[in-house]
Amino acid sequence: MRRRGGWRKGFGERLGRYSTKFKQAISNRDVIWLHAVSVGEVNLCVQIIKALQPRLPNIKLVVSTPTTTGMSELHKKPPAEVGKIYYPMDRRGYVRRAFATIRPKAVVLVEAEIWPNFLWGLQSRDIPH
């Protein structure tokens, strides 16, 4: 993150801290959290969003990515009402804070990456993934 630059962008989100605007957008809503790492996964996520939105109109979709390139692609493609956040660093406290804020009903990992603390958090909260 530091070598490529841009590490300050979304730094709070990487620690599981989200803006008031984001918190308001997801409050009192059922959330499905989609996670995409690469630009290719972000593009695949856009297709998933297009399929889910008409079927689940009352669900708030949130997409996360750990990279600045993934985030710039996210801002170009999905509809504005889709939440876009940086993925929290896979440390127990940051992940716990993210879950406490987002409270997802389900999580879609676009590809099988190994995120141990995130996966343990899903399992301990009985969140389908």
What is the role of each PLM region?
Residues 2-129:
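Active-site and donor-binding regions of nucleotide-sugar-utilizing enzymes
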